[in-house]
């Protein structure tokens, strides 16, 4: 594993499906100054779409004549849709015009969100959420672009700025979504999200650099290349598995939190009050720039180890938080700090370990969201059968799996270091 992502030399691969012309025209003037802030804002809005349903579950259940725990699977549908969109659309960032792709996906997501707002049943709502989430892959098309354009010694910090936008969107979905849902109804929240997605998605597409690309090979060559790319890169594989464990633990806890906070057996809060709890997620937005600096300085491995230690500490605090609000608040801060630090480190590594950053980023994010979707799917039944303690058990199991599974395949740098020490020992013996 590279000691610092900013100094990594991408390994050669045969993945790229397009030849990039060097004459691409980038943003200039005011557009250049707005480039990173607008991308971060667009990332926040589009990321929020994936999590809109979670804080609105009690309102959706009431409107559909059901219970919150019975419709909790909608949160998993959103994450599965996002993972599917990543598989099919994110690899296209290496082979097609990103301006057109961002604009098209933004319009598809807008239409799906409006359809969700008009849904008469959970089946139709789930279908609309699935499509909206699949089209909400714009952030993962933009992160590789930001990494490409950033100076080498500030790459992780620029990536961290976009990730800070992503987690701000997650917080906004819970806080503002809960408040707006309580005031205007859950359907109005989806309409508002559709408007913001259209405006910011098209604005972001407008300021993206003009790219002249000549595609070679099938359109979805990047998708086909993912398994081989992960197999050839131990560093990428390690980042994928560890983030799947971390994101799965966070997802199990965070998507089930509304059930603990709003149901009578828990804290019995209103949807609006429970949504305010999402403000603790702002810890992620604060930690992201700090984590970027730490990755640039100390390398990804140390940051990921520290993040896993924080997450492991948060799980017993979450369990205690089933009865003690102070413990729940502390755990929420810790798990968000752990998630974003791990994400910045692992994603920077994924973007710099191969010569096909969009495809590598797809593999990384799909792994994370697949882990999150599966953990969320298990957390709902766990809450129904064993209460909040069952959810905490799912989160703990995901952390253990994410860490121990990577121990059987050391990273490239670790193997290289051991080989170098062996060579030096032999030479000194001679």
From Swiss-Prot:
Keywords: Cell membrane, Membrane, Transmembrane, Transmembrane helix, Transport. The keyword Transmembrane applies. The chain crosses the membrane at residues 34-54, 70-90, 101-121, 126-146, 159-179, 188-208, 244-264, 275-295, 315-335, 362-382, 383-403. GO terms for molecular function: transmembrane transporter activity. Its main location: membrane. Belongs to the major facilitator superfamily. This is Probable transporter SCO4007. It comes from Streptomyces coelicolor (strain ATCC BAA-471 / A3(2) / M145).
């Amino acid at each position: 594993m590279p000691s610092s992502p900013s100094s990594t030399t991408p390994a050669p691969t045969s993945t790229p499906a397009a030849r990039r012309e060097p004459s691409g025209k980038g943003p200039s003037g005011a557009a250049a100054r707005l480039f990173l802030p607008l991308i971060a804002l667009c990332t926040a809005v589009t990321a929020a779409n994936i999590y809109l349903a979670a804080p609105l579950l009690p309102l959706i259940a009431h409107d559909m004549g059901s219970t919150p725990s019975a419709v909790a699977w909608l949160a998993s549908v959103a994450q599965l849709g996002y993972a599917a969109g990543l598989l099919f659309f994110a690899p296209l960032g290496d082979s097609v015009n990103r301006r057109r792709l961002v604009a098209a996906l933004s319009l598809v997501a807008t239409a799906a969100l409006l359809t969700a707002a008009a849904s008469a049943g959970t089946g139709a709502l789930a279908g609309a959420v699935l499509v909206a989430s699949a089209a909400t892959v714009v952030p993962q098309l933009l992160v590789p672009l930001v990494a490409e354009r950033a100076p080498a010694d500030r790459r992780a910090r620029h990536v961290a700025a976009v990730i800070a936008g992503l987690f701000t969107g997650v917080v906004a979905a819970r806080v503002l979504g809960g408040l707006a849902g309580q005031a205007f109804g859950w359907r109005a929240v989806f309409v508002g999200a559709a408007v913001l997605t259209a405006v910011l998605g098209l604005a972001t597409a407008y300021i993206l650099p003009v790219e002249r690309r000549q595609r070679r090979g099938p359109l979805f060559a990047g998708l086909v290349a993912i398994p081989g790319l992960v197999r050839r890169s131990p560093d990428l594989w390690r980042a994928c598995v560890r983030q799947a464990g971390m994101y799965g633990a966070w997802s199990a806890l965070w998507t089930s939190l509304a059930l603990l906070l709003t149901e009578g057996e828990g804290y019995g809060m209103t949807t609006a009050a429970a949504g305010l709890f999402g403000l603790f997620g702002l810890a992620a937005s604060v930690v992201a720039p700090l984590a970027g600096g730490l990755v640039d300085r100390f390398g990804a491995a140390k940051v990921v180890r520290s993040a896993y230690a924080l997450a492991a500490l948060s799980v017993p605090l979450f369990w205690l938080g089933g009865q003690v609000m102070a413990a729940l608040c502390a755990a929420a801060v810790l798990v968000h700090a752990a998630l974003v630090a791990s994400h910045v480190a692992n994603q920077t590594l994924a973007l710099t370990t191969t010569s096909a950053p969009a495809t590598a980023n797809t593999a990384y994010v799909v792994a994370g969201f697949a882990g999150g979707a599966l953990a969320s799917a298990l957390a709902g039944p766990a809450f129904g059968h064993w209460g909040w303690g069952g959810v905490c058990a799912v989160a703990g199991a995901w952390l253990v799996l994410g860490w121990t599974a990577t121990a059987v395949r050391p990273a490239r740098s670790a193997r290289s270091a051991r080989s170098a020490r062996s060579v030096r020992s032999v030479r000194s013996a001679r």
